[in-house]
Amino acid sequence: MRLGSVISEALRNIGSGTAHAVVMFLAVLLAGTLLGGYEAASVIGLEREATTRITALADTTTIMGTAIDGSVCDRLAGIDDGPSMAGAMRIGDPLTPVSTPGKDITSYQITPGMIDLLAAADATGRTRPDASGIWVSSDVAHDFGLAVGGPFATDHGTATVAGVFDWPNDGRDTRFVYAILVPVSATDGTFTECWARQWPASDQTETLLYSTVVAADGQNPAGVMAVNKGFDSHYDAQAGYLNRMTRWTPLAALAVGLLLGIVSVRRRRLEYAGALHSGQTKGAQLLGIAIETLIWGGSASAAGAGLLVAYCVRMSQSDPMAVLVAALRTPAALFAGVMVAAMLSGLTIRESQLFRFFKHR
């Protein structure tokens, strides 16, 4: 039987409804999209959990209680596989705005590295590092009508507002909620704290923070703690991803695909046995089964993959491609199961079974 004849017969079977292509298409599309979507939703949930932690500075650690070398602290950000950002701080003199003589505002002196950390932590994404003036929290800016580039008159003189940072109440250290931050040189004396931000978390961070200590005080030893204590300190993003419940969805999809492939052939086994009795070769029959299955199974898998692409691009906040790669394994496994099961089921059909199939029809 020529290739053109096999292809035309397969297309006629699909067009006439003999192959039940529409039903099988919908079954593959539904199974692939639901299982793949479940996997995508699970990975996106883990992604959002990680994003929430990063936004809330749950990935930031601080060392306090002793003298800190500001220069060493700022340079932690340049260490290979070390913190992405690091900066030092110390409490400064209270500042009294000229407009409210009886109201002091706590101020902190910070190194340039701390400014980078504050700018990166801003959820709006509009904050830019600038050490040319003071930084004020959004609450202070709201109460005094301050804006970036504008003046702020205090009992220590008039300063330019270089930045306004947001400091939400999400479990993080509350000292910056209502504060003025004054940039100083990292070599300007010692500091009382060093903050380091590293994602994913590493045991190396604590060791690096201790390296910033100038001189330890036996009565007040240095201690390392999280900037945001509202999150689990033992959180492991990689372990959460590897142990997610939906990691088995490709296997479930493979099982569904095998079932659909078997059903698609067994429901037509009398037809296939009759074709063999009429002189059709086994090779031509298997090729016809492969073409029909490829058409309805492949098109359904492609359509499901398209839906998953749209979902991942729309819902993923940071890395849609990584989510998509995880999700597409499911429709791929489903399609592989359909093709393999259909071909193997076709191999089991023989001409000698015609009478038995007809008898049990």
Predicted regions and their residues:
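Membrane-proximal extracellular/periplasmic loop immediately following the first transmembrane helix
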Residues: 1, 43-112
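A short amphipathic helical element positioned immediately N-terminal to and/or at the very start
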Residues: 3-18
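Peri-transmembrane interface segments
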Residues: 215-253, 263-264
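Alpha-helical transmembrane segments
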Residues: 11, 20, 30-58, 70, ...
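Transmembrane alpha-helical interface segments in multi-pass membrane proteins
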Residues: 274-342
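C-terminal membrane-exit region of the final transmembrane helix in multipass inner-membrane proteins
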Residues: 333-361
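A hydrophobic alpha-helix feature that marks transmembrane segments and, especially
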Residues: 39-40, 250-273, 285, 290
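Basic-flanked hydrophobic alpha-helices used for secretion and membrane insertion
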Residues: 76-83, 90-233
